[in-house]
Amino acid sequence: MQIMEPFESGFTIYSKSGCSNCTKVKKLLIEKQFFFVDISCDEFLIEDKEQFLLFIKEKTKKDYKTFPMVFKDGKFIGGFDDVQKYFDKLLCFDENEIF
């Protein structure tokens, strides 16, 4: 079983069927006009769930088992709530503001 690595550019979403937060995070990224790659994990979960979770643990550096699993530029962000927080932090900074 070959699992795609998180992309080094843009957002990578590991999702599964029937996951409402997976749908929400994709909708949010579309609304914000961000490029993302969606990797459906249904097959991985059926074929070898243990191997998939070990792969995710290696990438996230934690025991993360909930969907979606979202990465930005190859770095783990978290799930839907974490992506919302990520965008909230971006909005806190005005790009024209000088520090």
Which residue stretches match the model-derived regions?
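Catalytic phosphate/metal-binding cores of nucleic-acid and nucleotide-processing enzymes, i.e., regions
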Residues: 1-2, 85
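Non-catalytic, surface beta->alpha helical segment in thiol-disulfide oxidoreductase systems
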Residues: 72-99
